[in-house]
């Protein structure tokens, strides 16, 4: 297990609603991803496109975002955060200087708050560590 995998485990511990997760570089390269029954299945092409969304984050609500071959509407973005939703599933992604933390979740809007908090916690820690 790499050190990056430990951050994935920590992220899962932040919310039971998190089903899959990854940490990618700002270029879309995979640093760590959940596996086995909770395998994060986004392709290399998807992740490169997804990482590029942060270059023009304010346009993302108009176009949405694709992960794991699913198109999500994006009702909200913030400076370094994208929130995607489709029915009872969604994702939060937070960008640091070098990394993007992504958590895919299942559940209602009330559960999404803990997912967001977990993603932001990991992202803030990575940013404070120089990533």
Swiss-Prot record:
Tissue: Expressed in the intestinal wall, the spermatheca, and the pharynx.
GO MF term set: actin monomer binding
Gene3D superfamilies for this protein: Dynein light chain 2a, cytoplasmic (3.30.450.30)
Keywords: Actin-binding, Cytoplasm, Cytoskeleton
SMART domains: PROF
SUPFAM superfamilies: Profilin (actin-binding protein) (SSF55770)
GO cellular component: cell cortex; cytoskeleton
GO terms, biological process: muscle thin filament assembly
Database matches in CDD domains: PROF
Signal peptide positions on this chain: none
Compartment(s): Cytoplasm, Cytoskeleton
KW Transmembrane (keyword) present: no
Entry superkingdom: Eukaryota
Function of the protein: Binds to actin and affects the structure of the cytoskeleton. At high concentrations, profilin prevents the polymerization of actin, whereas it enhances it at low concentrations. By binding to PIP2, it inhibits the formation of IP3 and DG.
Subunit and interaction comment: Occurs in many kinds of cells as a complex with monomeric actin in a 1:1 ratio.
Family: Belongs to the profilin family.
Entry protein name: Profilin-2
């Amino acid at each position: 297990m790499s050190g990056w995998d430990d951050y994935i485990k920590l992220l899962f511990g932040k919310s039971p609603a998190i089903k899959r997760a990854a940490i990618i570089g700002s270029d879309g390269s995979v640093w760590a991803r959940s596996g086995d029954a909770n395998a994060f299945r986004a392709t290399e092409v998807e992740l490169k496109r997804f990482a590029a969304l942060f270059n023009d984050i304010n346009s993302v609500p108009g176009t949405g975002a694709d992960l794991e071959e699913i198109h999500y509407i994006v009702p909200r973005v913030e400076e370094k955060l994208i929130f995607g939703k489709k029915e009872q599933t969604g994702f939060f992604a937070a960008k640091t200087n070098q990394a993007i933390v992504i958590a895919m979740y299942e559940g209602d809007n009330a559960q999404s708050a803990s997912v967001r908090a977990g993603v932001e916690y990991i992202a803030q820690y990575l940013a404070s560590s120089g990533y």
